[in-house]
From Swiss-Prot:
Its EC number is 7.1.1.-. It comes from Rickettsia akari (strain Hartford). This is NADH-quinone oxidoreductase subunit B. The gene is nuoB. It is a peripheral membrane protein. Its main location: membrane. The keyword Transmembrane does not apply. NCBIfam families: nuoB_fam, PRK06411.1. It is found in: Cell inner membrane. Keywords: 4Fe-4S, Cell inner membrane, Cell membrane, Iron, Iron-sulfur, Membrane, Metal-binding, NAD, Quinone, Translocase, Transport, Ubiquinone.
Amino acid sequence: MQHSFYQEDELLNNEISNRGFLLTKIDDIIGWARAHSLWPMTFGLACCAVEMMQAASSRYDMDRFGMLFRPSPRQSDLMIVAGTLTNKMAPALRKVYDQMAVPKWVLSMGSCANGGGYYHFSYSVVRGCDRIVPVDVYVPGCPPTAEALIYGLMQLQKKIKRTTGFKYDARQIH
């Protein structure tokens, strides 16, 4: 029987309330804490950023996932790239990514960020932000709905929970 994302949290809460304590591996606790305390930094470049703002509004309530939008890359661990990435903007994207705290994740939002979108054949457009930074989750759509973004964030939370240990690339640590 497979459990959904929220059923796992419910089972965890039941175990703590029944026993008063929890037996687990440190990797599971760290993964759970990281997944439920994402601090995203927005990199809104086009119309997808409007949908991202809508997802952060009270109707969708992204705060329930433990997310707190941060204005600085040094305070964030998730970058949401939303919109058309141009060749002139690509070095800035990489610079901001390099300034983020480790561990860090990237969510690519919309057709333009995923693969160039409508402007794919333009000389000035990067054909996907994954050519500049490593991307963990792709959210399709033009523009993607707020529900699609929230689903992508839930997929990222599942991925973070599966990550174990403190294995970091030496190039990521400053």
